[in-house]
Amino acid sequence: MILGFIGTGKIASSVITGICKSNLKYKKIIISPRNKQIAKSLKKKFKKIVIAKDNQQIVDESTWVFLSITPAVGEKIIKDLKFKSSQTIFSFISTITLSQLKKAIKVKAKIVRAIPLPPISLKKGPVPICPPNSKVKAFFNHLGTTVEIKNEKSSINFWSTSGMMAPFYEMQRVMSDWLVKKGVKRNNAQKYITSLFLALSEDAVIHSKENLRELVKESQTPKGLNEQGVNELSKSGFYKSLEKTLNSIYKRLDK
């Protein structure tokens, strides 16, 4: 199997890295020359990487084609590429729907929308896919945990929550910077905060079959620090603002 990636940004680079670190079997990975620095770096790291001369070469030579480009670039270039009906085409594009992709691609190829995030480079994290596909599910299970979504409308919910990645990191940055202002060395501050969030996230995953309200409750003691923290953030509208932002992202995606 030959894998082809159109786009070599952060997501594409992360998926490619995860694939190369996995035990997946493939002949080679053909990547876009667009971001020369990332393309050359990937080729230097992994021996099965080939840099294409253009996007059409990627389509011509690949069994599976991954579209990892911005919506604006996607709208501009996809319609001019000549795909084959025998191919499986993956779209990581947030705002282009399956029906729009089918219209632009023109041939009756298998098209799957997927939502990988940067931790896929570590073979960690969920990968929602729509529509369900057994081969695609098996593929992404080598790189994380595949979540199959039958309804594209429902997939918008997952796309919306993927917009919380930068806010998650921003919260850690704010807390790390606060420690630095208090005299803690940056390396120590960032190591502590990121390790804290990792441990809390792992604990949440272990208890993910329970209502997360229980974790919120169990992490507080009467008049304790965590009770103060959650109450003050609630009063400030922090959590309502979080939900409002999710709704705003959802509306943008729900065309």
Sequence positions of predicted segments:
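Small-residue helix-packing motif on alpha-helices
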Residues: 29, 39, 58, 74, ...
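Solvent-exposed alpha-helices and their adjacent loops that cap or buttress functional pockets
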Residues: 4, 23, 82-83, 104-105, ...
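NAD(P)-dependent Rossmann-like dehydrogenase/reductase catalytic/cofactor-binding core
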Residues: 194, 198-255
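NAD(P)+-binding Rossmann beta1-loop-alpha1 motif at the extreme N-terminus of oxidoreductases
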Residues: 1-53, 57, 177-181
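Rossmann-like NAD(P)(H) cofactor-binding subdomain of soluble oxidoreductases
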Residues: 15, 30, 36-38, 45-129, ...
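Internal alpha-helical scaffold of NAD(P)-dependent oxidoreductase catalytic cores
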Residues: 100-110, 125-159, 163-207, 248, ...
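A short acidic, helix-capping loop that chelates divalent metal ions and anchors anionic groups
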Residues: 39-40, 120-124, 156-158, 228
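A general structural signal for well-ordered alpha-helical segments in protein cores
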Residues: 12, 39, 62, 74, ...
